[in-house]
Each structure stands twice: as C-alpha cells, then as structure tokens.
C-alpha cells in the first residue's frame, strides 16, 4: 500500500506554453487553471511574470482566483527584478511559491552566464534569501543539474537550503539523463548534502530522448517527493514529463513505488482534451493513458481475452482516467474470423 504522497507540480501554463504554437491568452490560462484545480494538482506554475505583461497578468489572475485551492507558483531567474516581479504577481494568493533558478553546469556557466562557481553560489544564496523574505515557500532549481558536476551541485544545493529554499528541484533541462544516472543524482544529494532533509526533492525532466517519465519515476525511487510535469507532455522542444503518465504509473504500480498522488484520475482525459483544444496540439492516437487508441483492441486474440475479462489486456479501466464510456473504446470484430467470434 502507498506510504508517501507525491506532490504534483503542474507547469502546463509555464513550460507547456513554451511549446511552439502553444501560447495561451489569459482567459484560456484561467480555464486551464480551473481544470487543474479540479484535477487536484498540488502546485500550478502559472507563468514567468517578468517575461511579459501578459504573463504577469495571467499569474496575478490565477493567484487571485485559485490561490486558496492550490499553491500558485511564479518563476524567476536569480535576479532581483525577476524575484520582485514574481512576488508582485503572486502576493494575492493565499498559497504561493516563488521558484528561482540559476544554471550550474559548466557549459551554461561558461557560455551563457559568464560566471564562475563562486559567483553562482553567491547569486543563488542572495536570490533565495530575497525570495524567502517575501514568501516562506521557496523553490530553487539549479538549471541543467543533470549535466552539473556532482560535488558542485551538492555545494549549491546545501547553500540554497541554508538560505531558505524549501524545495530543491533537479532539472534535466535538455533531456540528456538516463533513468539510472538521474536516480543516482538524487541518491548522491541525499548522501552528501547535510541539510537535505530540510527540503523536498523534486524532479523536472524533458523528453528529448523519450525518457522524461522514466527519469522522473527513477527520481521518485530515490526519494524525490515532487514531480514537475505537464498535461499531454507539452513543453520546450520534445516536451516535459506527461502528468497523466506520471500519475497513472504511480496509481497502477503503487505496489512498487509505494507512493500515490492527490490527483482525481477520472479527470485526466477531459483535462487532456481541454488543453489540446485550447493549444491546438493534437494528442497522438497511441499516446499512453489519453490517446484515442489507449483502450482500443485490434488483434483478435486480444479482443477475445478482453471480452472474457478486461483485465487480461487492460491494466487500468477507461473510467479510471475519465474516458467517457465504451463509445470511445470500441471493440471491432472486423479482424475476427467467424469461428473465433463463435468461440468468444
């Protein structure tokens, strides 16, 4: 039986919107936010307030309308103006979180930031402290953590926790990690950061190698208790870990992970379709959990087994994820021979 509850951090309105062609108007973001609240996600990252006036307005409106039902989060670079702007958008929420990030990998420090390790640590500490002065719920992300030298990652994480970070999010920013390697990062942090018990460990994975969900679950296996994800796996480039896949993996394999979530799984399918309709990003037919074929059976042997006992070929029920009845999950006999049909 599950013994721990995983915090589901939804970033559809921030990272998901960064999918090319997926920008949303404020009214559309509010519609998605309402669906996410009904879905039961714990944290909604509503946007990047300093990015544009529209993003600021969206975070502010989501904070005002839903900040008493979910934790509303705003993203900020480790810059004073970013943190101040994010707080301005979030301050009306009853439950709010400031999420600050700073790259820590050698390639980002050298080529993007032009900063050395000492400067990175100093900046991270100062901006986490500034965020903590505003808000008791502060998340720190060492961007590109999956490609960061582990000893330096431990140093930055320890200093960020000392400065007031309550969640430490480990991003696989470019989708480079593999499950065993990504899990080992979490294990290393738990073994080498003296104050790691004072913060929640989180995973944020991109899908460039098709491993975002697998890497996130590997992190859960090594102690992550928050997973950052998006509806339908929307996100930069190849996308993020798909929320519906994370949630149903934990629900279906609770015997293995010994974890569950607070998500109302019967709202996964309608939420998926809402996001698809608003963004214009179609859900591929064979997409796990919410694809049109997810509960369809074509092979005659499979149909025969399903008709006798659905669990022979289905590890979850359509109604568990909100698929509205068998009309959307037809069992076709077109490939069954007459003798096979008569034997069913």
Name each model-derived stretch:
Residues 334-340:
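Conserved small/polar residues in nucleotide/adenosyl-binding loops
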Residues 26-39, 80, 84-100, 104-110, ...:
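Alpha/beta enzyme core
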Residues 42-67, 105-113, 170-179, 237:
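Glycine-rich, proline-tolerant flexible connector loops at the mouths of alpha/beta enzymes
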Residues 224-239:
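Glycine-rich phosphate-binding active-site loops on the catalytic face of alpha/beta enzymes
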Residues 257-292:
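Phosphate/diphosphate-binding loops
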Residues 8-11, 44-46, 70-76, 96, ...:
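Hydrophobic faces of well-ordered beta-strands that scaffold small-molecule active sites
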Residues 12-28, 77-78, 111-117, 141-151, ...:
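Active-site mouth loops of central-metabolism enzymes
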